[in-house]
């Protein structure tokens, strides 16, 4: 346990919302979890599906919620800055994984960011996804806070970012592939949290 006023090496090489080296400006909360089921750990899939991840115990979520509430209030941390290791280092980290209940933290404890379902549905109904360029989609990811390259292709690093976003906001559909639902969620988040 590192005192809150001291630096720890929990994030490693990382970035979010234009900041890098987040060890200097963040507080990490480590949650003990096996993450991926033992019988699925040898899968060669870089993007494990939702059912490969293990559930968290309710007491873990209750305790982590208490810690986050305390730290966020003490340091006035905006909802959008409550993120996962996978959000800040998508090519290296997958924790806390697909079964970490971000939506529950938002709804039950008022922690973190979450999208409005009505906005998501509205963006899904617009049917503009297929006409949206890769560079425009990547710009939406950057707008939310993710560091992503400016290539006009879905290379491995870009898919890592999409997978990290999906782990956080669309975990049952976490594949690393950008799709209509994931894009609609991203647009809904950028509408709700414009800065």
Show the residue positions of the predicted features.
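Active-site-adjacent loop/helix surface patches within enzyme catalytic domains
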Residues: 1-80
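Sec/Tat-exported extracytoplasmic proteins
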Residues: 2, 20, 33-35, 68-75, ...
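Second-shell loop/turn segments in exported
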Residues: 15-16, 47-59, 91-92, 123-130, ...
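A charge-rich, low-complexity, intrinsically flexible signal that marks solvent-exposed coils, linkers
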Residues: 21, 93-102
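Acidic/histidine-rich, metal-coordinating catalytic segments
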Residues: 77-92
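Acidic, His- and aromatic-enriched active-site or binding-groove loops in soluble protein domains
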Residues: 98-124
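Short acidic, glycine/serine/threonine-rich helix-capping segments at coil-helix boundaries
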Residues: 125-195
